[in-house]
């Protein structure tokens, strides 16, 4: 099924088991599902606009023991393949991952039910970052405005409806977060919150390092905190997507690294929208004991 888009862009999403995805991903679905994970793979898992780039840089800095030069070896989007990524004729995320030596650090936005089965079968490590739904929606809205390969989001009012109905790329925020939360006790999953990393980055970075089996001294931890601050990353051309062509990401519309704050939703939501989403959250997340922070 193709989902309609706004008038500005001709991009359409198609669905896999009810989850909207970019057409190229759907066309490559067989290769994605048959992907062979390895037991020593670490998979970074996020819903879009939940701190993917941030946690990726943190993980890379930990892996490189805080060596900034080693983290400059390639653009961030090329260091750790995004497994479902597809844009022919370029190599797919699966092909890039297959060409990597072990141990591999990989990325995905897929919900649990669409993840290639080999990740579960090989008991891989998963690092999940969740962000509160209101800030996530705002960030995704601005990202879709500037991203030329995703559907036009329309007005904020229109996007609000699209998002709460799960008709955005990678589907429902509620299903995504709930799905990963519910399996975290059965697999090697470190479940983190964007807001906690913002509040106490050193504490959360230490958790990630321990999960990765890395012991870092305080000096290295402090360096990683400094190098992965929003301000540092926004000015880092290896991270800020400034090399991505305007035909793919038009940063004159909205920067890729926009604000990186907690509570920006208050600048976008009406009181009615906020109440409506609160009610929807209670209904959709019933039985899930997550208490998201909405402001710092």
From Swiss-Prot:
Q: Where does 3'-phosphoadenylyl sulfate bind?
A: 49-54, 131, 139, 194, 228-233, 256-260
Known tissue expression: Found in gastrointestinal tract tissues, liver and kidney.
Q: Where is the signal peptide?
A: none
Database matches in SUPFAM superfamilies: P-loop containing nucleoside triphosphate hydrolases
Q: Which residues bind substrate?
A: 107-109
GO BP terms, alphabetized: sulfation
Keywords of the record: Cytoplasm, Lysosome, Mitochondrion, Phosphoprotein, Transferase
EC assignment: 2.8.2.1
Q: Which InterPro entries match?
A: P-loop_NTPase, Sulfotransferase_dom
The terms describing its cellular component in GO are: cytoplasm; lysosome; mitochondrion
Task: Describe the reaction catalysed, as an equation.
Answer: a phenol + 3'-phosphoadenylyl sulfate = an aryl sulfate + adenosine 3',5'-bisphosphate + H(+); cholesterol + 3'-phosphoadenylyl sulfate = cholesterol sulfate + adenosine 3',5'-bisphosphate + H(+)
Query: Zinc as a keyword?
Result: no
Q: Name one GO molecular function term.
A: cholesterol sulfotransferase activity
Q: Where in this protein does the record say Phosphoserine is found?
A: 139, 254
The subcellular location is: Cytoplasm; Lysosome; Mitochondrion
Q: Which Pfam families match?
A: Sulfotransfer_1
Main location per UniProt? cytoplasm
Q: Which residues form the active site?
A: 109 (proton acceptor)
What job does the chain carry out?
A: Sulfotransferase that utilizes 3'-phospho-5'-adenylyl sulfate (PAPS) to catalyze the sulfate conjugation of phenolic compounds. Does not transfer sulfate to steroids, dopamine, acetaminophen, or alpha-naphthol. Except in mitochondria, where it can add sulfate to cholesterol producing cholesterol sulfate, which alters mitochondrial membrane organization, and impacts protein complex mobility increasing state-III respiration, thereby modulating mitochondrial respiration.
Protein family: Belongs to the sulfotransferase 1 family.
Q: Which PANTHER family match?
A: SULFOTRANSFERASE SULT (PTHR11783)
Name of this protein: Sulfotransferase 1C2
Q: Which organism is it from?
A: Oryctolagus cuniculus (Rabbit)
């Amino acid at each position: 099924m193709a989902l309609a888009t706004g008038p500005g862009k001709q991009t359409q999403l198609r669905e896999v088991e009810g989850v909207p995805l970019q057409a190229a991903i759907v066309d490559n679905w067989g290769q994605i599902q048959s992907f062979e994970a390895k037991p020593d793979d670490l998979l970074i898992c996020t819903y879009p606009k939940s701190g993917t780039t941030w946690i990726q840089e943190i993980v890379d800095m930990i892996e490189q023991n805080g060596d900034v030069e080693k983290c400059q070896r390639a653009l961030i989007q090329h260091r750790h393949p995004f497994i479902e990524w597809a844009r022919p004729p370029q190599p797919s995320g699966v092909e890039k991952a297959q060409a990597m030596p072990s141990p591999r650090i990989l990325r995905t936005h897929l919900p649990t039910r669409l993840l290639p089965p080999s990740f579960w079968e090989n008991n891989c490590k998963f690092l999940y970052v969740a962000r509160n739904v209101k800030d996530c929606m705002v960030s995704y809205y601005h990202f879709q405005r500037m991203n030329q390969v995703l559907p036009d989001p329309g007005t904020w009012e229109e996007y609000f409806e699209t998002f709460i109905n799960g008709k955005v790329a990678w589907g429902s925020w509620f299903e995504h977060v709930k799905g990963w939360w519910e399996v975290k006790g059965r697999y090697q999953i470190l479940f983190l919150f964007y807001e906690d990393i913002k509040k106490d980055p050193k504490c959360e970075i230490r958790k990630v390092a321990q999960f990765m089996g890395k012991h870092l001294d305080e000096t290295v931890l402090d360096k990683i905190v400094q190098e992965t601050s929003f301000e540092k990353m926004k000015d880092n051309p290896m991270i800020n997507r400034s090399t991505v062509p305007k035909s793919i990401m038009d940063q004159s519309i909205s920067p890729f690294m926009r604000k990186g704050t907690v509570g920006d939703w208050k600048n976008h939501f009406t009181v009615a929208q906020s109440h409506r989403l609160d009610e929807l959250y209670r209904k959709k997340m019933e039985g899930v004991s997550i208490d998201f922070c909405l402001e710092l």
